[in-house]
Amino acid sequence: MITFSSMLLKLQEFWMKQGCNIVQPYDIPAGAGTFHPATFLRSLDSTPWSVAYVAPSRRPTDGRYGENPNRLGSYYQFQALIKPSPDNIQELYLKSLEYLGLDVKNHDIRFVEDNWESPTLGAWGLGWEVWLNGMEVTQFTYFQQVGGIECNPVAVEITYGTERLAMYLQGVDTVFDIVWGENEHGKTLYRDVHKEAEIEFSKYNFEIADTEMLFAEFNAKSAECLKTIEARLPLPAYDLCMMAASTFNVLDARKAISQTERQNYILKIRELSKGCAELYKAQEEDRNKRVKG
């Protein structure tokens, strides 16, 4: 049986063998792997770029106090981004499942058309969900726009739902029974690593978080992001955009924002991410000269 730790390592190993640079998780909370600058910003460059990484993801509204068998407020995606997109990407994906020990010929694997959109990132793309015996385990997306900018060349993003995939590979019915690792002292389960955090962060995000402080933080990070864009610094500006988005997610979980206001906040974050993307793209030629020395 493959452990959760081994599965993540093998995915990195597989995509590294396909030419992807393995980078580390980003150090700012985000709701999805697409927020990582290695995807959001680097997908805008006109030069080839291939990258893969584990993406710890936080979605406070999805927390369930550790009581739901497959719904979490904090979880892990595995992300691979390849630009330009190879013609055999579906074949490579199936080989990645085989690399994890899955006999793809004896399972019902379906590519179901499902176009993707991220309103806060001004991003959308064409793609599929991948269903493994009736359970969605992966999302494929051919990026058409990121930050409101058309992607040329087009990159393909593969996002694995790692917990769902591990549940299937290990034959368990709840995420908390996933075997995280194993050594001479026995097995470490997902519950040993994460269940208490699910309980405590659910209570914080739904009941305790200081909304007045969070509104002030959102406004401060947004203003600082705009100031940093004006200073022509897209990378720190995008960090501030990510921080504002993360703060919004907690406010959303706290139900501190009405439906009408919610859309306005999403548009504010979209404008910030768009400003970062436009500046990053505009500086591409000069940045390449600086980087190449």
UniProtKB/Swiss-Prot annotation:
Record GO terms (molecular function): ATP binding; glycine-tRNA ligase activity
CC per GO annotation: cytosol
EC number: 6.1.1.14
Pfam families: tRNA-synt_2e (PF02091)
Keywords: Aminoacyl-tRNA synthetase, ATP-binding, Cytoplasm, Ligase, Nucleotide-binding, Protein biosynthesis
PROSITE patterns noted in UniProt: AA_TRNA_LIGASE_II_GLYAB
Enzyme's top EC category: ligase
PANTHER family tied to this protein: GLYCINE--TRNA LIGASE, CHLOROPLASTIC_MITOCHONDRIAL 2, GLYCYL-TRNA SYNTHETASE
Known partners and oligomeric status: Tetramer of two alpha and two beta subunits.
This protein's name: Glycine--tRNA ligase alpha subunit
Provenance organism: Sulfurimonas denitrificans (strain ATCC 33889 / DSM 1251)
